Amino acid sequence: MSVHESSNEINDEPMDTDSNIPESSGNDPSMEVDDEPESSDAADSFKRFERLLQKTENFSHCLSSGDAKLATGAPVDTKKRGRPSKKNGIDGDHRHRKTEQEEDEEMVADAIKSDDLVIFDKSPFYIENGEMRDYQVRGLNWLASLQHNKINGILADEMGLGKTLQTISMIGYMKHYKNKASPHLVIVPKSTLQNWANEFKKWCPSINAVVLIGDEAARNQVLRDVILPQKFDVCCTTYEMMLKVKTQLKKLNWRYIIIDEAHRIKNEKSKLSETVRELNSENRLLITGTPLQNNLHELWALLNFLLPDIFTSSDDFDSWFSNDAMSGNTDLVQRLHKVLQPFLLRRIKSDVEKSLLPKKEVKVYVGLSKMQREWYTKVLMKDIDIINGAGKVEKARLMNILMHLRKCVNHPYLFDGAEPGPPFTTDQHLVDNSGKMVVLDKLLMKFKEQGSRVLIFSQFSRMLDLLEDFCWWRHYEYCRLDGSTPHEDRSNAIEAYNAPDSKKFIFMLTTRAGGLGINLATADVVIIYDSDWNPQSDLQAMDRAHRIGQKKQVRVFRLITENTVDERIIEKAEAKLRLDNIVIQQGRMSEAQKTLGKGDMISMIRHGAEQVFAAKDSTISDDDIDTILEKAEVKTAELNEKMGKIDENNLRNMTFEDNAKFTVYQFEGENYKAKQADGMGHFWIEPPKRERKANYQVDLYYKEAMRAGNPTEKQSKAPRPKLPQVFDFQFYPRRLFELLDKEIYHYRKTIGYVAERPKDVPPKEAEKRQAEEQKLINNARPLTDKEQEEKAELLTQSVTDWTKREFQQFVRGNEKYGREDLESIAKEMERPLEEIQSYAKVFWERIEELQDSEKVLSQIEKGEARIQRKYAVKKALDAKIAKYKAPFQQLRISYGTNKGKTYTEEEDRFLVCETHRLGHDKENVFEELRQSVRMAPQFRFDWFLKSRTAMELQRRCNTLITLIEREMGEVVESKPVIVTAADKKKSVAKDLSKSSGTPTAKKVKATPK
């Protein structure tokens, strides 16, 4: 065994460091860069970026130039003996020429230094039952170099390259070479927990791994007898269990915290992300095969968990990696790639695993059965207004339509009531009523003859129910795993399928539950029954079989229903996957589209709708399976060729032709993107004609015959009065409503209308009111000519011609600014001040005439109360801040008994002073406060405060302001003068007492019966 230089060995895989970086003698890369406070000014963003690059380059330098020794067998005792050597000079200062004495002392220090980095050139002695592959040994060396330099990282090898084994070997290295056996914490998905325990026993039996799972009694026993006394090396648990026992786990100081499938913490605000950040640990390691699933912010969340002092601001990170900043800037792209190199190791199978044959994917296009076509049409017809662009487009409604269409193309029996019965039978109709099932049946027969074993993935657990019935009918032995499968049953099913000479032919799984961390390499065929929205999930599913240990070529068959939503989902996923290849494999970290927009969903729904409506019969092919697969391979090659021609910009815009002729907005030769602003545009799908049978329309015949045989003469009635469109907020003269009431009563008299009895009052009172109403009808008379002229004149005397929307603007203006600030209301409404003043005078005099006067008045008074409260808070804050010359350093808060343990006094002082500086009455003040907290240099390592939301900061500030008001002992009076509802009612009642006649109508428009 020959001695290797550590820098050459480590640089082989994970990073390309610059050999010209100045030499460093320390192992702490953070000492290489002055940790000067980061400015909160946006203008300093570039400087912060330069600092980040400098820090990461120094990390990379430490990884490549650290001291190393070759591992030649079992470790020796390397404890330091004697006194430690003294160091002269300033730590980290290597810019000046050394004196001879300094150089001698440094050489002596290097000679007696024992904490060397161990470099492996073959599988370590503590790994049993097999040998690690070369690239896995290099991965172990990379992990060891991270630990040696006190740096956390992400092991992001492609799925199936043995990330679990590399991690286990790293923990073995900690035990056998670093004498740091425990405790280590491994947090994994529930589906892979038992697999991790088995892998520890298989590869490194010297490590004592304990599994923490079970009910409360079982958990408490493990915690009491094993975890808290630290009688273990590694604790393996699940995400859910981690949240349940977080209090006990916080009591330990962990050597390593390792999170498998680390994209589970891509949302830094999730409960799991917050909890794992609160654990104490020396090192952290994230394991994921898909470090970038949707956008760069998720990658920042992972890096922030590993290195919160380096990756502090998500806003800065997002802006540096934005599309605009990176477009056409090759130098910036290369430097950004350098940022990630020290922390992220990413390798793909084609580069490192030559013995594993590449998987072959074929897209198999199928038709619709007659029943599928009928149900697909029903779903489209139910929401035809959405499809034709005439209805209200809501994202939740669109997603619901998409999900129903996906159920149609999978199997119509997913809808309740679709399956014929009772009695319900399991026979040929289960296959014939679904195009995918017809092809699946042919495929499975072929694979059974070939001796292959099959994995079937679907999004729908109820689809697995149908597949179970199908397997029972065809006498196929199978295993099943979905999100509701108990942990013990999962382990038993995987072991039964992977057992030597297993007779299990099919393993059916839901994509999300079975696509993570499960080794099913004994299967060589993967069937994607329906595709996931996220193409990474399908890749993870395929790699359950396409992984180390696979001896055959893995074939993947993706079932797609032609001219349906399936095709659009696949095209969207393909484009997203191509973009991911550009981003990850080339080191390009620009942001990809995260979620489906409304336009994408509408396009998916519309795709193929006319073909579905036009045809009536089944379009399932009768070809044999070999012919179907030949056509599928040709079509797959064509699609791959088309996608390969698309450049990155078109991928981001979801354009599927390099001449931009066809986009997701393209349908039947027209582009509806340009017509989106025109409402319906010219888009219209003609629904299928409804076919009616005339055999049962006897009732209609007799109805027409009776109408023809008994002609009735039309009664002469008074013409229906033409009532004007009047609104209560326009404040017409009261006399107008009296005349309108007379007109209505006379019309009711002419048609013989009988007054209805009120239902919401006691019987006697109801009878009395009915009699009074009927008396008014009986005594009614038509309007005289003079009254008609008077009515016409009164219709011209409205206070305003405002619409309902403008009136609501006026009410909101009073609520926002107060009834006295008419100038601000006028600016808000963009109306002349004189007009607002004139209307406001009438409004407050006659507000009781409004139909919902109490609601309007209450709304305004609540707004004025908020104004008064803001004024009181401002006055209290002004008085408190004025007591100190330097309030950010000197301000004291009298907590009394309300101190609490969540926020420190320094944090509270900053919140109060910064809120006062920004202005408590300012809109979005707490969002600005949140940004100030994140930019404040004194809180750069205060993860708790930096992770608070604007709402949480608002609640804390409200508590502090209450304490300050109590401390100041003042009752602050507000400037606005509030007129109460009671006072206004008295004023209106006084005006009404002067008028007489029929009570005025409050309805917007009187409608005679």
Swiss-Prot record:
Compositionally biased region (Polar residues): 17-28
Disordered: annotated segments: 1-48, 63-106, 760-790, 984-1009
UniProt cross-references to PROSITE patterns, sorted A to Z: HELICASE_ATP_BIND_1, HELICASE_CTER, SANT
Name of the protein: Chromatin-remodeling complex ATPase chain isw-1
Single Gene Ontology MF annotation: nucleosome binding
Basic and acidic residues composition-biased segments: 760-775, 984-993
Record keywords, A-Z: Activator, ATP-binding, Chromatin regulator, Developmental protein, Helicase, Hydrolase, Nucleotide-binding, Nucleus, Repeat, Transcription, Transcription regulation
CDD domains associated with the record: DEXHc_SMARCA1_SMARCA5, SANT, SF2_C_SNF
Domain of life, source organism: Eukaryota
Role description: Energy-transducing component of a NURF-like (nucleosome-remodeling factor-like) complex, which would catalyze ATP-dependent nucleosome sliding and facilitate transcription of chromatin. Involved in vulval cell fates.
PANTHER family linked to this entry: CHROMODOMAIN-HELICASE-DNA-BINDING PROTEIN 3-RELATED-RELATED, SWI_SNF-RELATED MATRIX-ASSOCIATED ACTIN-DEPENDENT REGULATOR OF CHROMATIN SUBFAMILY A MEMBER 5
